[in-house]
């Protein structure tokens, strides 16, 4: 990001947030009181939604042998609304219940990266895994289950936390960077290198953002190898199609962009809106969450299918290193088009 240190010299870091860390660059200092409030929000967020914390509400649902009724905080409502929309728009390919598949494939709380022996018989909704649409009954921010359900809110959870933190900033200009997922409010464009998934020291393009959210997904960020036999290993990553429970193929990286009206940042919100059911409202109020979710969805759904529900700009890189992008994607791209 060009000259960011000069334009936004005040940096606040949350090194352990969501496992990837978060960094806020701003044109004015973030005071101790604001930083403390942000730290409290991050702690509450993980205590509720992280499947990697044994004491989280999400982990409790996964251990409830007979299910139950689980009350989430009001600030979860827009996140659940977004998952409703993504589940519908992708015909179930994006589903929080994919947590069970991730665990069977080795992406569990202990990071064992060891596939369970029974995984082939149980992966995906096609083989009977629980689904958001059927096995999790939602009443606002209350989720009702009839047995243990392993939920994972990683598809858009990081972006949603970025949005909530952005609502707490009084700065005129800021950039929130959560492991490459960005929320930007600036007076002049910020230039951002689009990382090459094959070599993090290279870029396949440069985006230019003034106000908006730009989020990326790539298997290269989180993958592991599993031995089939003494001679053969297969690569597994965390971007799964929830229908069959298998890692998505053919796409190497994706980027999704949601623009923001500058007025969006001029209002101070300490908590999430309790109702944001309409998809345009979700995108307007939680652009990073939507961009995060769509960057994941681009691995498992056709663009045209997603565009029936969401208005967004995108770019994708396929296995042949050809890039496809919408005309309104705000970037210079260095590779040939698909």
Name the predicted role of every residue range:
Residues 1-338:
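Mature catalytic core of soluble alpha/beta enzymes
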């Amino acid at each position: 990001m060009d000259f960011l240190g000069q334009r936004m010299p005040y940096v606040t870091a949350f090194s352990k947030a969501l496992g990837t860390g978060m960094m806020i660059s701003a044109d004015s200092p973030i005071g101790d009181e604001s930083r403390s409030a942000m730290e409290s929000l991050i702690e509450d967020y993980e205590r509720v939604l992280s499947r990697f914390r044994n004491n989280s509400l999400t982990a409790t649902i996964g251990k409830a042998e007979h299910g139950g009724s689980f009350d989430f905080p009001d600030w979860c409502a827009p996140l659940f609304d977004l998952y409703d929309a993504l589940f519908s728009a992708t015909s179930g390919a994006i589903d929080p219940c994919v947590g069970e598949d991730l665990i069977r494939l080795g992406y569990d709380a202990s990071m064992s990266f060891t596939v369970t022996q029974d995984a082939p018989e149980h992966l995906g909704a096609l083989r009977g895994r629980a689904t958001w649409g059927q096995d999790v009954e939602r009443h606002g921010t209350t989720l009702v289950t009839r047995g243990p359900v392993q939920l994972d809110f990683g598809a858009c959870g990081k972006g949603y936390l970025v949005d909530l933190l952005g609502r707490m900033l009084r700065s005129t200009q800021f950039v929130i960077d959560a492991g490459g997922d960005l929320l930007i409010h600036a007076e002049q464009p910020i230039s951002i290198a689009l990382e090459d998934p094959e070599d993090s020291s290279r870029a396949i393009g440069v985006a230019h953002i003034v106000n908006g959210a730009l989020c990326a997904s790539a298997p290269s960020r989180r993958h592991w190898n599993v031995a089939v036999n003494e001679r053969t290993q297969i690569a597994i990553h965390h971007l799964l199609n929830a229908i069959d429970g298998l890692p998505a193929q053919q796409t190497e990286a994706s980027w999704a962009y949601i623009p923001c009206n500058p007025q969006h940042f001029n209002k101070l919100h300490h908590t999430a809106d309790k109702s944001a059911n309409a998809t345009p409202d979700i995108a307007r109020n939680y652009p990073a969450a939507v961009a995060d979710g769509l960057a994941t969805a681009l691995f498992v759904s056709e663009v045209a299918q997603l565009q029936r529900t969401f208005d967004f700009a995108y770019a994708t890189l396929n296995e042949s290193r050809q890039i496809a992008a919408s005309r309104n994607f705000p970037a210079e791209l260095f590779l040939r088009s698909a």
